[in-house]
C-alpha cells in the first residue's frame, strides 16, 4: 500500500509531462506554414475553388494613348478561369494622385485556350491624371499594386518580342537573329527565365551595344495564401508565353510602329524592301482595311559553328536548306490594333483584318546540325525532308550582316566571352523531347489529340557543373484574401546565380 501511494505522484508528473509535450507539438505544427497547393497530374481538373488566384505580371500607365485613351491603365496577369468564369470579368480600380482619387471599373479580355486553368488576361481602365498610387478593390478589401509608365520611345520603329527563353544555350541562333534584325531595322526585346551564364554575358554586351533589350520573365509564385490553389506554372499554357507577348505589346504600344511576336528561332528576311518598316508598310498599303500581317513558319536546317571565332553568317546561309513544311505562323501588328495577343494571334482581332503573307515565310531553324555532321537525335521525331533554300536572302545583306558580326566579334569583351560559350547541345534535345512527348507527338504525329493543358513544366532539367545558369528572380508578394480574386505580384526583379537552369 505504501508503494502504491508513492507512485501516484509519479503517474501525475508523467501525465503532465506528456501533456505538455503534446501541446508543444500541436502548437509547433499550427505555427508552421500550411501548403494550399493542389496537384493535378492529369492537367485536366475543372474543380471550382473558393477563390481565383491571379499573378500580375505588369501594370502600365499611359498618360495618353492612341487606342486606350487618356490616363489609361493596362494590366497583364495569369488568372484561374475555372474557379470563377473570367468571361467579361470586371474589377474595381482605385487611382490616387497627390490631391485626388478616382474609382473606375476595369474590363478584361483573355487569350489562350479553355482547358488551361490559368489564362492570360489583359484588363484596361482609365484613372486619375498624374497617377501616384494604384489599388485593386473588392468587397471592401483592397491591395496596392505596382505600376510603370509605358514606353513612349523605342530604339527602332519595329520591335520584335522574343518569347521567354529558359535553359537557353543556342547562342548561334541568337547571333543569327540579332544581326539580321539589326540589318533590317528591328530591335529584339528578349524575355529570359534562365540562360547559360556565358550566353547571358554575351546578351548583356549586345544590350550595351543597343541591339536588344533584356527583360525578366519570372516564375509565378504565390508567397502567402489562405485559400487553396493549383500550381500556376504547371497549369498555364507554355510558360505563360501569351502573357509575355501581351506585356511586350503593352510596353511598346505607344512607342513602336510595328510589333512582331517571334521565337528566337523565327527569323524574317524581307523580300522586296531593304527594311522591315518599308516591307510592312508596303504590304498594308496594298491591302486597305488590314492592320496586321501573318507569316507562316517554314522549317529549315543549317550547320552551326561550335565556337564564336568560327561563326560565319555567310557559311550559315550557304548551309541553309528549306523544307516543304510550313507550320502555323506568327504575327506582325500595328500596336493600336491589338490590346492583347495569344502565342500566334489575338482572338479579339478579326482574322479578316490580317494579310496572309505567302512569301517570304519565317525561316524557322529549330534543330540545327553540328559542323562535324552530327545531327541532333530530336530531329528524327519530326519526319521532315530538306532541300535547296527557297527563301530570298540578298547578297548585299549577307555581306553587311557578316561585317557587323565581325565588328562585334573583334570587341575585347566579346572575345573574352567567346571561349566560354557552349560548343554543343545539352538542354535542347532534352527540352525538345519533353515537349514532343507532352504535346506535339499526339497533336501532329499520332493526331489523337491532347486533353491536358499544353505545358511541359514537369520536364526534368539536369543541372550541370560545367555550365551554370542565370535565372530571373524578384521579391514576391501576396495581397490580402479577396473575393472572388486574390492577387499576387512582384517588385525589384533581379538576375540570380543561385537557382539554376529551370523553367
Swiss-Prot record:
Gene Ontology CC entries for this record: membrane
Membrane disposition: Single-pass membrane protein
Residue ranges annotated for the GT92 domain, each copy included: 156-441
Pfam families documented for this protein: Glyco_transf_92 (PF01697)
Top-level taxon of origin: Eukaryota
Keyword Manganese in record: no
Compartment(s): Membrane
EC number from the UniProt entry: 2.4.1.-
Enzyme class per UniProt: transferase
Transmembrane segments: 7-27
Key words, A-Z: Glycosyltransferase, Membrane, Transferase, Transmembrane, Transmembrane helix
Gene Ontology molecular function terms on file: glycosyltransferase activity
Stated family: Belongs to the glycosyltransferase 92 family.
Protein name (record): Glycosyltransferase family 92 protein ZK381.2
Organism of origin: Caenorhabditis elegans
Amino acid at each position: 500500500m505504501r508503494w502504491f501511494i508513492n507512485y501516484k505522484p509519479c503517474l501525475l508528473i508523467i501525465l503532465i509531462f506528456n501533456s505538455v509535450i503534446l501541446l508543444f507539438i500541436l502548437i509547433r505544427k499550427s505555427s508552421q506554414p500550411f501548403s494550399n497547393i493542389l496537384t493535378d497530374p492529369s492537367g485536366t481538373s475543372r474543380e471550382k475553388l473558393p477563390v481565383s488566384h491571379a499573378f500580375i505580371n505588369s501594370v502600365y500607365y499611359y498618360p495618353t494613348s492612341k487606342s486606350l485613351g487618356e490616363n489609361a491603365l493596362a494590366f497583364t496577369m495569369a488568372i484561374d478561369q475555372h474557379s470563377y468564369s473570367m468571361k467579361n470579368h470586371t474589377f474595381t480600380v482605385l487611382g490616387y494622385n497627390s490631391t485626388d482619387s478616382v474609382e473606375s471599373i476595369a474590363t478584361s479580355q483573355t487569350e489562350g485556350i479553355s482547358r488551361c486553368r490559368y489564362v492570360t488576361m489583359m484588363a484596361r481602365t482609365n484613372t486619375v491624371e498624374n497617377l501616384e498610387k494604384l489599388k485593386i478593390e473588392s468587397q471592401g478589401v483592397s491591395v496596392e499594386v505596382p505600376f510603370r509608365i509605358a514606353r513612349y520611345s523605342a530604339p527602332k520603329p519595329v520591335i520584335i518580342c522574343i518569347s521567354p527563353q529558359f535553359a537557353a544555350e543556342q547562342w548561334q541562333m541568337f547571333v543569327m537573329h540579332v544581326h539580321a534584325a539589326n540589318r533590317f531595322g528591328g530591335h529584339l526585346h528578349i524575355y529570359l527565365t534562365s540562360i547559360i551564364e556565358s550566353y547571358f554575358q554575351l546578351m548583356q554586351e549586345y544590350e550595351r551595344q543597343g541591339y536588344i533589350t533584356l527583360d525578366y520573365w519570372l516564375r509565378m509564385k504565390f508567397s502567402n495564401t489562405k485559400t487553396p490553389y493549383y500550381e500556376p506554372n504547371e497549369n498555364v499554357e507554355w510558360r505563360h508565353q501569351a502573357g509575355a507577348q501581351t506585356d511586350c505589346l503593352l510596353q511598346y504600344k505607344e512607342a513602336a510602329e510595328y510589333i512582331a511576336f517571334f521565337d528566337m528561332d523565327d527569323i524574317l528576311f524581307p523580300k522586296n524592301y531593304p527594311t522591315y518598316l518599308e516591307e510592312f508598310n508596303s504590304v498594308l498599303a496594298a491591302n486597305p482595311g488590314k492592320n496586321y500581317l501573318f507569316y507562316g513558319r517554314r522549317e529549315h536546317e543549317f550547320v552551326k559553328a561550335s565556337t564564336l571565332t568560327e561563326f560565319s553568317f555567310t557559311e550559315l546561309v550557304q548551309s541553309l536548306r528549306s523544307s516543304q513544311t510550313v507550320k502555323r505562323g506568327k504575327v506582325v501588328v500595328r500596336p493600336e490594333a491589338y490590346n492583347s495577343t495569344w502565342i500566334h494571334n489575338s482572338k479579339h482581332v478579326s482574322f479578316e483584318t490580317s494579310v496572309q503573307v505567302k512569301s517570304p515565310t519565317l525561316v524557322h531553324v529549330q534543330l540545327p546540325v553540328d559542323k562535324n555532321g552530327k545531327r541532333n537525335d530530336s530531329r528524327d521525331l519530326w519526319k521532315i525532308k530538306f532541300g535547296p533554300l527557297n527563301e530570298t536572302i540578298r547578297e548585299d545583306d549577307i555581306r553587311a550582316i557578316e561585317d557587323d558580326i565581325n565588328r562585334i566579334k573583334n570587341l575585347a569583351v566579346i572575345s573574352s566571352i567567346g571561349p566560354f560559350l557552349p560548343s554543343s547541345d545539352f538542354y535542347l534535345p532534352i527540352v525538345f523531347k519533353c515537349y514532343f512527348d507532352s504535346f506535339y507527338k499526339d497533336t501532329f504525329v499520332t493526331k489523337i489529340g491532347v486533353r491536358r493543358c499544353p505545358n511541359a513544366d514537369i520536364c526534368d532539367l539536369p543541372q550541370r557543373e560545367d555550365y551554370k545558369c542565370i535565372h530571373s528572380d524578384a521579391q514576391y508578394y501576396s495581397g490580402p484574401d479577396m473575393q472572388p480574386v486574390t492577387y499576387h505580384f512582384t517588385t525589384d526583379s533581379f538576375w540570380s546565380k543561385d537557382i539554376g537552369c529551370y523553367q
